[in-house]
Amino acid sequence: MKFFIVLALCIVGAIADPVSSDQANAIRASWAGVKHNEVDILAAVFSDHPDIQARFPQFAGKDLASIKDTGAFATHAGRIVGFISEIVALVGNESNAPAMATLINELSTSHHNRGITKGQFNEFRSSLVSYLSSHASWNDATADAWTHGLDNIFGMIFAHL
C-alpha cells in the first residue's frame, strides 16, 4: 500500500508542475540533435565522473578509450539513451504521466538495488546537461525546459531511492 501512495504522490507531483507544450517542444528538438550520439553521451558521463564508470562491472577499472568503441559499451549506451528517448517522447502530455511514472519507478528500483546514490544521479544529470548544451541547439529557453523536466524526473527518482 505504501508503494502505491508514493507512486500516486510522484504522479501528482509530475502533473502538478508539468512542462509546457513549448518546453516539451524545446526538449524534443534539442534531444533530436543528439539522440543518436549514444556512445559519446555515455563516454562524456564516464569521463566527467569515473565513479559512475566504476559502478558498471564490465567497465570498471578499464581505460575509457579502450572500451568506448566496443559493442558492450555501445549496447549499454543505447539502453541509457533509449530510456531518455522514451521519456522525451512522453513529456509534455499530461495523459502520459502514468507511463512516465512507471518507467521512472522501474529505473529507480533497479538503480536503488545496485546502490546508486542521489549524488551519482546528479552527476549523471550534470554531464547530460553539459553534453546537451555543447552539442545540441541550446538557448536559455531550452536550458529552462530541460531544468524543469529534469527537476520533475529526478524528483520522482529520488522519491524511490
From Swiss-Prot:
Classification of source organism: Eukaryota, Metazoa, Ecdysozoa, Arthropoda, Hexapoda
Pfam families registered for this protein in UniProt: Globin
GO cellular component terms, semicolon-separated: extracellular region; hemoglobin complex
PROSITE patterns: GLOBIN
Ranges where the Globin domain occurs: 18-161
Keyword entries, A-Z: Heme, Iron, Metal-binding, Oxygen transport, Signal, Transport
Assembly notes: Homodimer.
Cleaved signal peptide residues: 1-16
Residue numbers binding heme b: 76, 111
Protein name, per record: Globin CTT-IX
Family indicated by similarity: Belongs to the globin family.
Note: There are at least 12 different components in Midge globin.
Molecular function as annotated in GO: heme binding; metal ion binding; oxygen binding; oxygen carrier activity
